[in-house]
Amino acid sequence: MNTNLEDNYRHKGLRKQLVEALRAKGITDEAVLTAINEVPRHVFLDSSFVELAYQDQAFPIGSGQTISQPSTVAFQTQLLGVVKGMKVLEIGTGSGYQACVLASMGAKVFSIERQRNLFFKTKEILERLPFRVKTFLGDGYEGLPSYQPFDRIIITAGAPNIPPALVEQMKTGAVMVIPMDNAEGKGQIMLKVTKLEDGTLKKEEFGDFKFVPMLKDIGND
């Protein structure tokens, strides 16, 4: 990741262009677009990718992980429907960019990362930024039972199923956005899952995506 946290006029200009590109791609939630405009994506990338930081593409961040393309971050965040003050659980901290977008929107963000090296690298970056994110090294399938319940849960990796432990940690009326492995095993379908009053789940599908797999346990890659 980039150790230079400078955010200059050029970076801000590129972010404005990115926001307009996302608007053209169908992102309509102004709170999401404002957050994308506020969070400096280039600081989460390796210095060799800084010049490309505001293009709509994913980049490797080490430990076999990627930073999702901005349109995917914006799409998932828009589906989540975050309101200021909500408790949001993120599974897969990765670079920390998605967590900062959520924090910029006023969410109380709790984020789990399973890759030890990536966890500490990202934690160091986050501590130098103005966005408040609580990070945890752990297994995303288990969630954070001691911090439950959550208003929103966002998963940033492809999951084979909806983890039962995470459902238990959702408030009634809470929403989970999760990329679920499709039947062919060649990608994911984006699901919006709402927990109803009787405890059942309402599931809505929102198109095909490609994510790294959601893995169990703590990794040392």
Whereabouts are the PLM-identified features?
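Class I SAM-dependent transferase core
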Residues: 1-89, 97-101, 105, 118-121, ...
